[in-house]
Curated annotation (Swiss-Prot):
The protein's name: 1,4-alpha-glucan branching enzyme GlgB
Cellular component terms per the entry's GO annotation: cytosol
Pfam families in alphabetical order: Alpha-amylase, Alpha-amylase_C, CBM_48
Source taxonomy: Bacteria, Pseudomonadati, Pseudomonadota, Gammaproteobacteria, Thiotrichales
Cross-referenced NCBIfam families: branching_enzym, PRK05402.1, PRK12313.1
Annotated Gene3D superfamilies: Glycosidases (3.20.20.80), Golgi alpha-mannosidase II (2.60.40.1180), Immunoglobulins (2.60.40.10)
Enzyme active site: 318, 371
Reactions it catalyzes: Transfers a segment of a (1->4)-alpha-D-glucan chain to a primary hydroxy group in a similar glucan chain
Gene Ontology molecular functions: 1,4-alpha-glucan branching enzyme activity; cation binding; hydrolase activity, hydrolyzing O-glycosyl compounds
Record-level GO BP terms: glycogen biosynthetic process
Amino acid sequence: MKNKNSEQNTHYTIGEQDIHYFHEGKHIYAYEFMGAHKACEEGIEGIRFTTWAPNAKSICVIGDFNYWQVEDKNYMEPITDAGLWSVFIPNAKNGDKYKFVVTNKDTSHYVYKSDPYAFFSELRPNTASIITTETQYTWSDDKWLEKRAKTNYYDNPMNVYELHLASWKTKNGKFLTYDELSETLPQYIKEMGYTHVEFMPLHEHPLDASWGYQPTGFYSVNSRHGDIIGLKRLVDKLHNNDIGVILDWVPGHFCKDQHGLIYFDGSPCYEYQEPTKAINKGWETHNFDLGRNEVKCFLISNAMYWINEFHIDGLRVDAVSNILYLNYDREDGQWIPNIYGGHENLEGIAFLKELNGVLKHTCKGVITIAEESSSWPDISTPVEKGGLGFDFKWNMGWMNDTLRYISLDPVYRKYHHNLITFSMVYHYSEKFILSISHDEVVHGKKSLINKMWGDLWNKYAGLRLYMSYMIGHPGKKLIFMGSEFVQFVEWREYEQLQWQVVDQYESHKQTLHFFKKLNDFYHNETALWQCDYDHHGFRWIDANNSQQSILSFIRSSKDNKQKLIFICNFTPVTYYDYHLGVPDAGSYKEVFNSDNLEFGGSGQVMATEIFSSPQSSHGFEQRIIIKIPPMATLVLKLIK
């Protein structure tokens, strides 16, 4: 098995070791010989096609090179008894379109299939694969990769901007190309102060409305935006602007369109044999057979492909619950227990551990993030310590609780105070990312601004309050595009964000400015990210003031030299002469206030320093007396 971290060779032949490791489920670079690759055999240049179809009777390659005719010379030959097929076609070349005609050995029924390992495909609604051998790119991100390999993300800032390329911006109603995005996106992300972008899936998918989460071409770059070189150039540009790139990745299930992986050889192949495990009724997709060696090779090699070939810095693994649970989205009687009688998918668990183990061993500095909504334990615990091995987990509980809380009339918030404090009870059980993702601003859930309570002023104030509270809460951060300039309509994947409102309305411009300042504040204050997962980094001052709906807490740096005091007022009431216990004697200065006039607030800021007095309060020996603005987060810092 070849072990490499550079782009694939222009010529690569299949060896005995490749075949052995592939069928053993241990090949992590299967894309180097599976699919369509440039080859020179007996002095003749051409393309070697290789695929896996264990229940095929025959496979013929048709395409531009043979006028899409089934010809004897283009039939693949079986090279193993376990379903590997291959053929060399001399006159096939880069850019030719092609498909496989796969005939099932039991029924003699044939189907036209796209190549599962194709690097590029036709733009929907067309479905042919495209021979793509010219993929070499001269990268200029060596410094970034060196830095990545040495970075401990747990004690560094991580503030992620999630986006959907097709609807971030368009040009005259058409998709922007990767090269066009390279001209605008990196600069915007850098100016706004985000540390990473997270792209929703970039592999090929037939339905725009699936957002990429129902893929057909796992190795095919999304052709809506251009080609492989264009995407590499975009990632390179982001890295050169000191921005990491995370990719949403979907290893649990696949689209059931007939040209794709479904019943690839006329029978269950990439999916489970058992229909109750194979068919995902909720999403109308098929679940991968994660216990089958060749399927594991397909998926783990796919993760390696995106990381090695496109220098992706992290994978956000989609729908992990669907991989972990046999009864996910199924009623009683619709699923079969495992060999121990439980609902755990033992094959899925083993796959996730193997995936994370491989990436940890081979891809220094690359992270994996689990989108998982259950209480499954030890998701972000290393595999060697009994966990699944992810680096981070989205905190879906925090997201649900706090969005519910922030939508309540402040009159009733005191009765639901636990919604805004409960997350700290379990925060240290995982390495959490606080995520407000695309799923929260679509399908009738309302835009983020419209989740806020009240009239327009209170909605804007509530958004600033909520985002400032989020920045102060331990854990890394993620926000979905459009929230930063207050898009009032829900996200629509078929049109660009409503950027025009920034120029048309001062309130949108002020909020965009607020997000930039908040992001800069986060990045510059080590207390906000250095101890996200260390008990030392967070301490409540008062978590129990439900009557006034006020939270107060301390964030600290590792050396304890930097301390920030957060006071979050979730009511539209100004509190005068508020007594607050503080950990140290001295002078305190306001360093951030979401009620600032420049953000669109009422301007109730602390213009002068406040000195503590030796009077006990909230369990501390020192106390300060402050004014707390309405619907706002106030952040104080000890300066002397």
